[in-house]
Amino acid sequence: MQLARLQRLVIDALEDVKGQDIKVYNTTHLSELFDRVILVSATSNRQTRALASSVAEKAKQAGADVLSVEGQDAGEWVLVDLGDVVVHIMQPAIRAYYALEEIWGGKPVRVRLGAPPAPAARPSRQ
């Protein structure tokens, strides 16, 4: 699956379950293992699990490989490995403590968050 399509699929899956503070980092210059790291915050263990399930389910439906899902038992930090894209779903305290944004560095990739606006309905002519 194309990287841009997989990245969009992940963002949409995270937004469907109300993931917060989504950041995407280009890691092609830092690692040969994956091209993107996506960080997202969740407000509870239940939400971290729901976000991970949403990402894994939508990836499978689209034909992408889900290589691994780790951390669901504890639920404070869940990692979903999709090969080219690695998703870290974290509660805010864990995210602040580990500061992965500093590790993956620099500026996040600019992506449009949220669904595109629906076209305005036109009144029917009768």
Predicted regions and their residues:
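Long, contiguous binding/interaction regions
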Residues: 1-29, 43-50, 57, 70-71, ...
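Active-site phosphate-binding and catalytic loops of NTP-dependent enzymes
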Residues: 61-69
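A short, glycine/Asx- and small/polar-enriched loop/turn
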Residues: 32-35, 81-84
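Short glycine-rich or small-residue beta-strand-to-loop segments that form or flank ligand, phosphate
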Residues: 36-42
